[in-house]
């Protein structure tokens, strides 16, 4: 991740070496901050953004632990409150300017490959397929007359196309 570097420091009294994260003030592509608070982190393994601060902690701690093993040092993990690293991280976040993009502006289907620039934080549990929607046809043709059905399908199409943020209209279904 690009918002910290791994560093070592040695305790002069005991001679023990510790591994820790040095949070860098940079325009990060992996971390989003909104309103002086953590907003999202890029989870490379899943190809999605995550708004879970505990996942961020796990990703950073895994990196620190791996580096500590390589350098034969003691890891100072975010998970442990005694190390003070979580407090340092929270202070770091509060000092950063806003750096965020709205997440999930477009639908992401199950097998769709995502990139960081797609700003997706969740996937639908199914894929979009080109199959005849027999049940949908039966239900919608029973409930709506052709003009109202066309309006509804236009709205659904705008959601699927990702145009809803550009269109200032909405539809309410009730009954």
Q: How should these model regions be labeled?
A:
Residues 1-119:
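Intein modules and their embedded homing endonuclease domains
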